[in-house]
Amino acid sequence: MNATVHDLDGGDAGSVELPAIFETAFRPDLIGRAVSAAQANRKQAYGADEFAGLRTPAESFGSGRGLAHIPRSENVARRVPNAVSGRAAHPPKAEKDQTKSLNDKERQLAIRSAIAATADAETVAERGHAFDEDLDLPLVVSDEFEDLNKTQEALGVLEAVGADADIERAEEGRSVRAGRGKTRGRKYSQPKSVLVVTSEEPSRAARNLSGVDVATAREVNAEDLAPGAHPGRLTLWTESAIEEVADR
């Protein structure tokens, strides 16, 4: 199985033989577990203060007043979960273990399966990516792409090969996030677009484009290839990255 190699102008620069990893069976179940584990393992511990709701001089009036024996301060109930203004019954605990484990062989198979999904045009289209209908996947460009330093140069290559529509889709899809997250450093929600995989170091030229992520063939993971556990990300590979990913 071969893939067309494009030059920086979008022309045909030959072909490259795809390694066997691109023939891996499609396993969305394992990909989902790998992404879920990656997200869980980077969660920050979160919990309520151990003494939250207890720092009050509230006392129980005891018997004889026709009132519940709830500790009160100025006639306001405290400490009791089912009372107004009472403490939380079962608040989140900071010591809770939120990590998830995954067998090494399962994780490796998930990555290989996600890599193979980048070569399936139907899977990539179902994920919502926009690209020219006549574009052959996987999208491979010559190693000259790794020498680019300017964002406009990288965008020009994407336009030449027919993948620039996905950058526009991601840029137009950027919106203010709903909920409290926008006050916690996550103001905008940004759709994912092209993943750029190189051989030596992540591409500096492409990393500032809307929705674009960059990675090396050795370090690309399941979450890069399947954000949100949805496999089939539109991926641009350099020729050397294709050869290097064979060892994954």
UniProtKB/Swiss-Prot annotation:
Compositional bias of kind Basic and acidic residues: 92-103
Region feature Disordered, mapped onto this chain: 72-103, 173-210
GO biological process, one term: translation
GO function term, MF aspect, one: rRNA binding
A cellular component annotation (GO) from this entry: ribosome
Superkingdom as given in the UniProt entry: Archaea
InterPro entries cross-referenced by the UniProt entry: Ribosomal_uL4, Ribosomal_uL4_dom_sf, Ribosomal_uL4_euk/arc_CS, Ribosomal_uL4_euk/arch, Ribosomall_uL4-arc
Compositionally biased tracts (Basic residues): 177-189
Pfam families: Ribosomal_L4
Keywords from the UniProt entry: Ribonucleoprotein, Ribosomal protein, RNA-binding, rRNA-binding
Family affiliation: Belongs to the universal ribosomal protein uL4 family.
Function per UniProt: One of the primary rRNA binding proteins, this protein initially binds near the 5'-end of the 23S rRNA. It is important during the early stages of 50S assembly. It makes multiple contacts with different domains of the 23S rRNA in the assembled 50S subunit and ribosome.
Protein name: Large ribosomal subunit protein uL4
Species name: Halorubrum lacusprofundi (strain ATCC 49239 / DSM 5036 / JCM 8891 / ACAM 34)
Lineage: Archaea, Methanobacteriati, Methanobacteriota, Stenosarchaea group, Halobacteria
